[in-house]
Amino acid sequence: MLEVILNTPAQLSLPLYLPDDETFASFYPGENASLLAAVNNALYQEHGSYIYFWSREGGGRSHLLHAACAELSRQERAVGYVPLDKRAYFVPDVLEGMEQLALVCIDNIESIAGDEAWEMAVFNLYNRIQETGRALLLITGDRPPRQLNIRLPDLASRLDWGQIYKLQPLSDDEKGEALQLRARLRGFELPEDVSRFLLKRLDREMRTLFMTLDQLDHASITAQRKLTIPFVKEILGL
C-alpha cells in the first residue's frame, strides 16, 4: 500500500494508505487517452494547474488519482489525497496548508454538496493554490461541475474553470483487456476465454472484476493450478 502523508501548518500528519497496484501502468485508458495525457503532462509542469474529471462510481477516477499520487511519491514529492466520501474521518481544516504540496487530489467532491464548512474549505484551498501557483489540483466527481448542486456560488463557478473531462466507461472488450493487463502486472496470465466468461457471468463493474481477479490469483497459487473455466466455476461457485 502507498502511504501518503498530509502535512498541515499544525504539523499534523495523517497517513493515508492507497492501493499500490493502482498506478499509471495498470490504468487501462480505453477512450481516455487525452485525459491520461493531460494528467501526466500537468504533473511535470513548473506552475500549478487544475483538472476536473468525472465518471459514475467505479469508473476509474479514484484509480487515476491514486496513480498520480504514486507517480510523484516515487520522486519524493509531497502529495495529498482527500477522499471526501470519507470526510467523517476528517475536518475541513485538513486542507489548510495543502497549497504547499506538489499535488492535491480531492476525490468524490459531490459528497460535500450542501455542506457549508467543506464547500468553503475547498473554495479557500482553490484560491490559495491559484495564488501560490505551485500545486496541481485534481478534483473528481460523479457528474459535470455544473450539476454538482454546490450551494456556494463562487465554488461552483471555480469548479467549472480549467480542464474538464468525462472519464469514458470501458466497453466489454476493453474491460477484458484491462483484466488481462492487471493479471500480467501481477505475474500471471488470464486466458481470453476465462476473461470473457467472467464478463458474461459477473457484475461488469471494474471494482468487482478486479476483486474477483485477486481472488482467482490467490486460489490459483494455493491450488497450483492454471486459470481455466472449470477451475473458475469451482472457485466462484458458478
Curated annotation (Swiss-Prot):
Report the SUPFAM superfamilies cross-referenced here: P-loop containing nucleoside triphosphate hydrolases
Give a yes or no for keyword Membrane in this entry. no
UniProt entry keywords in alphabetical sequence: DNA replication, DNA replication inhibitor
- The organism's superkingdom is given as Bacteria
Please, one GO biological process term? negative regulation of DNA-templated DNA replication initiation
Under InterPro entries, the record lists: Chromosome_initiator_DnaA-like, DnaA_dom, Hda, Hda_Enterobact, Hda_lid, P-loop_NTPase
> What Pfam families does the annotation carry?
Bac_DnaA, Hda_lid
Keyword Transport among UniProt keywords: no
Q: How does it assemble?
A: The active form seems to be an ADP-bound monomer. Forms the RIDA complex (regulatory inactivation of DnaA) of ATP-DnaA, ADP-Hda and the DNA-loaded beta sliding clamp (dnaN).
Summarizing the function annotation, the protein's role is:
Mediates the interaction of DNA replication initiator protein DnaA with DNA polymerase subunit beta sliding clamp (dnaN). Stimulates hydrolysis of ATP-DnaA to ADP-DnaA, rendering DnaA inactive for reinitiation, a process called regulatory inhibition of DnaA or RIDA.
- Give the NCBIfam families listed for this entry: DnaA_homol_Hda, PRK08084.1
Q: Which PANTHER family match?
A: CHROMOSOMAL REPLICATION INITIATOR PROTEIN DNAA, DNAA REGULATORY INACTIVATOR HDA
UniProt similarity note: Belongs to the DnaA family. HdA subfamily.
Query: What's the name of the protein?
Result: DnaA regulatory inactivator Hda
Provenance organism: Pectobacterium atrosepticum (strain SCRI 1043 / ATCC BAA-672) (Erwinia carotovora subsp. atroseptica)
